[in-house]
């Protein structure tokens, strides 16, 4: 039987991917004004401030005394640090279709990692429906491709994103017994803030004024506030909760929902046109997600 924590975990996974799907639009708006490093610096510093407030008010506690923080360092290194380097710059050195296809592979790689390190083995039907969902994403990205070339550098960077994004999910699940959802999420924002602020300052010749200059741009600020509070604070908190209370295959397949949300946001907000085949592919993605939830391993049904 599946309990309430499982239902909450699946709900959290869905809401997370809505936030992350919309984050592509917010990132595009933010990068009209600044580089990816500066945008990430703002994002994670604001997120860190937001999460520090409840700590200072005594509403949340960090129980790290006597614990090794090496797992948290590894977690934060995978994501946000290395993942966003791979994703942001992988897209820059390849076309959008290839990038979308590479990122769509993350659920399958994550399931493989979970089977190897967490001993979570999905059912054959879950493998099938996961592949179906990925097929839908491939069709969408090819149909919506805006052109561009593919370089080896772009491929290598996207491989970094795939491996680190998959590793993050598995590590978060693996350390859930030692560190709370809040502790994991908080530490990720610390590492993101330090890492990307350092890179932003290096990129701008050490000029703090240059990094702070975009703060007067309202359109930029609204985009970065969504990224910080929605995609980082809410998104990572809910995803860390989800992987702690539901099988990895059931959670990670929702990653493909983010692409559906991203395409829908482009149509609604930016008035982009949707190819008919993309609409069919979006339905295929949703069927794939449904199938993964519908056909868990038999042992999960008996728990």
Feature map (PLM): residue ranges:
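Specific alpha-helical transmembrane segments that line the substrate/conduction pathway
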Residues: 38-49, 78-79, 87-121, 126-130, ...
């Amino acid at each position: 039987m599946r309990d309430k924590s499982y239902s909450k975990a699946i709900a959290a996974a869905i809401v997370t991917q809505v936030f992350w799907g919309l984050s592509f639009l917010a990132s595009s708006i933010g990068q009209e004004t600044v580089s990816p490093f500066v945008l990430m610096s703002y994002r994670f510093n604001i997120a860190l401030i937001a999460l520090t407030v409840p700590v200072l008010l005594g509403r949340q506690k960090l129980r790290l005394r006597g614990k090794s923080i090496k797992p948290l360092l590894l977690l934060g290194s995978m994501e946000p640090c290395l993942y966003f380097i791979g994703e942001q710059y992988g897209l820059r050195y390849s076309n959008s279709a290839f990038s979308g296809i590479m990122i769509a592979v993350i659920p399958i790689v994550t399931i493989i990692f979970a089977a190897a390190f967490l001993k979570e083995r999905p059912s054959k039907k879950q493998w099938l429906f996961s592949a179906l969902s990925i097929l839908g994403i491939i069709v969408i990205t090819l149909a919506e491709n805006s052109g561009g070339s593919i370089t080896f550098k772009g491929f290598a960077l996207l491989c970094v994103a795939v491996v680190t994004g998959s590793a993050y999910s598995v590590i978060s699940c693996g350390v859930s017994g030692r560190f709370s959802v809040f502790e994991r999420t908080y530490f990720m924002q610390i590492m993101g803030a330090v890492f990307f602020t350092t890179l932003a300052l290096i990129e701008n010749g050490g000029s703090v004024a240059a990094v702070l200059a975009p703060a007067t741009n309202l359109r930029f600020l609204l985009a970065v506030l969504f990224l910080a509070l929605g995609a980082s604070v809410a998104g990572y908190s809910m995803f860390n909760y989800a992987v702690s209370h539901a099988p990895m295959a059931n959670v990670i397949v929702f990653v493909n929902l983010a692409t559906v949300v991203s395409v829908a946001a482009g149509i609604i907000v930016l008035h982009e046109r949707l190819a008919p085949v993309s609409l069919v592919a979006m339905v295929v993605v949703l069927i794939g997600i449904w199938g993964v939830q519908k056909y868990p391993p038999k042992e999960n049904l008996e728990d």
